[in-house]
């Protein structure tokens, strides 16, 4: 038997959950499908940088993690070997902050708290995606059962193409080295972005620390990770 939903969202991470809740606020029904257990995101410590506009959207769906978010009030941008720098200040744009840094788990938790019990099919394996003239049919395995779901709109929001041959992948030959450091003195809510030939280096204020994201070619990233 084939089930029918208006919108099917593959991926129940922050992007998928935000879309689901925004659609619900507008009176649209959708279903989330995710290959991971629903609690898998609760331990993810990665830092996410969000714009002020993202905060406004999350506030509209009652999912802004106020206490967990660190505001970015200034951003210092420069290029290695280049002259000068750009300094962006929230006051120039009459904003409370240019953006915010929040841990993945805190944002995911705030969003998940607003989901209905039947909003997500967790630990689901996508078996096949078949497009039709005015719909898409998704075959999957969930809780040991085979299910067929027909939808008018299919959204990929899981960050990976999975086994879908219709999703193209571009290899940029870059890896991100991520760590956290404690600055002395404190970061004063300033973010830094430095462009280099190998890739950008970003320092994002998170609590009392900086979350460091250094984008490098794979071989150089491995060399950095091998350092003591």
Q: Which residue stretches match the model-derived regions?
A:
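N-terminal FAD cofactor-binding segment of flavoenzymes
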Residues: 44-80
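Glycine-rich, N-terminal phosphate-binding loop of Rossmann-like dinucleotide-binding domains
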Residues: 12, 38, 158-159
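N-terminal Rossmann-fold NAD(P) dinucleotide-binding loop
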Residues: 16-17
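Glycine-rich FAD pyrophosphate-binding loop
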Residues: 22-46
